[in-house]
Regions:
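Non-catalytic helical/linker scaffolds that mediate oligomerization, partner binding
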Residues: 1-471
């Protein structure tokens, strides 16, 4: 069973019921909805299709709402686009105008106050570069360094600048409330800069009684510098290499990726490696060798999940991309020395009961050659505690709550399983083993290690280990 989870962005190439079914059967664990594109009505219809198919297939596929975040974009151009030449003057303005090859409007009104002469401005993921020469009223007068085609709503990056724009825009707030209403399991907070940004998102969720898990997207230098504090208040991070590769020098992206994975693993948090993992498969049925190696290296480093963006949203081969990603992941996972990895993680064991029990569960399972670790959990916390130590055997996350099973589907190595409610803890444990057997995860004669928090239902308390032989 594959341990690393796969996230697929849903778009025109994958939003039909037929394609969603194929993606889920190919191995998609989480469906990502990019709220930079599409109306609420369009997103609602996509969500309903995902929900319909996951119920039909009885698979705990989770949904992730990816916010726009505090981004800066160009506004519209006459004819939809314009050509910029190296060396020419180009003006960015906060005035409401239709763009031309000489000037264009930007979405962030106060950009002129956050930058100065000499600042570098990048457009369209860095394909177009310009330098600020002067600021005159509402106009930012720039010299084009690298020219090219600019078009409607292309992204604008200002590497290294500390922007004063609020973190949650009115549109983002509406999107978050929409996500709460629809029942998304995860929320990706784009361009997270500091822990206060995540706490602001958390307060909206708490205010509306939502248990959505928050994934902080690290995409700029502020986020990188504040990574530790962001991790401490979020449920995980996404290594968003697209905008990160524009905001920081390209050669530093691999270094930052490794640091982010290492820090997230140490804190027992989700870490999603994203962007261009199988970029060539947007047009080709086979990936490059470099892409295969990129995926494998992220898995060797300990990433929780790997993500497809354009490959699954708009590519010619979305299902093949998922199958390819799954095969590469399984191959890398077969090569990992889990005992050695656990010994490295042992330094992260804390003195509290939960982490001590979680680590002991993993070492017991490894020493006994257990077929599986079975966690009986209401919220998914116990499974999360076990997952952080990345044992070699499968972790079966048994819960009576379908929503918890979907949230567990992003946990490394965890196979979620919904079981029926029982009157006693003992009956629940027996039912968990029986359901694991029925699902084919274990068989008669297997040794399994059961762990849970007793009494059940108190989140954040894992305090029991039991070793049993499956009857």
């Amino acid at each position: 069973m594959r341990k690393t989870k796969i996230i697929c962005t849903i778009g025109p190439a994958s939003e039909s019921v037929e394609k969603l079914r194929e993606l889920m059967l190919a191995g998609m664990n989480v469906a990502r909805f990019n709220f930079s594109h599409g109306t609420h009505e369009e997103q609602k219809e996509k969500f309903k299709r995902v929900d319909r198919v996951r119920k039909e297939l009885n698979l705990p596929v989770a949904t992730l709402l990816d916010t726009k975040g505090p981004e800066i974009r160009l506004r519209d151009f006459e004819g939809g686009r314009a050509e910029l030449m190296a060396g020419q003057t180009f003006i960015l303005t906060t005035d409401e105008i239709m763009g031309t090859s000489e000037r264009a409007s930007i979405s962030y009104k106060n950009l002129k106050d956050d930058i100065s002469a000499g600042t570098t401005i990048l457009i369209d993921d860095g394909l177009i570069e310009m330098t600020v020469e002067e600021i005159n009223g509402n106009d930012i007068i720039c010299r084009v360094v690298n020219g090219g085609t600019v078009s409607n709503h292309k992204g604008v990056n200002v590497p290294g600048a500390v922007l004063s724009m609020p973190y949650i825009s009115e549109n983002d707030r509406k999107d978050i409330l929409f996500g709460i209403k629809m029942g998304f399991e995860f929320l990706a907070a784009s361009f997270a800069r500091c822990k206060e940004d995540i706490l602001e998102v958390r307060s909206i969720l708490d205010e509306h009684g939502s248990d959505m898990k928050i994934i902080a997207k690290i995409e700029n230098m502020q986020g990188i510098q504040n990574l530790e504090e962001i991790l401490s208040v979020s449920d995980g991070v996404m290594v968003a290499r697209g905008d990160m590769g524009v905001e920081i020098p390209l050669e530093e992206v691999p270094v930052m990726q490794k640091k982010m994975i290492k820090m997230a693993v140490a804190q027992g948090k989700h870490v999603i490696t994203a962007t261009q993992m199988l970029e060539s498969m947007i047009k080709n049925p086979r990936p490059t060798r470099a892409e295969a190696t990129d995926i494998a290296n992220a898995i060797y480093d300990g990433t929780t999940a790997i993500m497809l963006s354009g490959e699954s949203a708009a590519g010619l081969y979305p299902v093949e991309a998922v199958r390819t990603m799954a095969r590469i992941a399984e191959s890398a996972e077969r090569d990992i020395d889990y005992r050695s990895r656990m010994s490295r993680l042992s330094g992260e064991v804390k003195s509290d009961i939960t982490t001590a029990i979680a680590y002991a569960t993993c070492t017991t399972a490894m020493d006994l050659g257990a077929a599986a670790i079975i966690t009986v959990t209401m919220s998914g916390f116990t499974a999360e505690s076990i997952s952080r130590y990345k044992p070699g055997c499968p972790i079966i996350g048994c819960t009576v709550h379908p929503r918890s099973s979907k949230q567990m589907n992003l946990l490394w190595g965890v196979q979620p399983l919904v079981i029926k409610e029982e009157d006693t803890t003992e009956a629940l444990f027996e039912d968990a083993v029986e359901e694991c057997k029925r699902a084919g995860y274990v068989k008669s004669g297997d040794i399994v290690v059961i762990t849970a928090g007793v009494p059940l239902g108190i989140t954040g308390k894992t305090n029991m280990i039991r070793v049993v032989e499956v009857e």
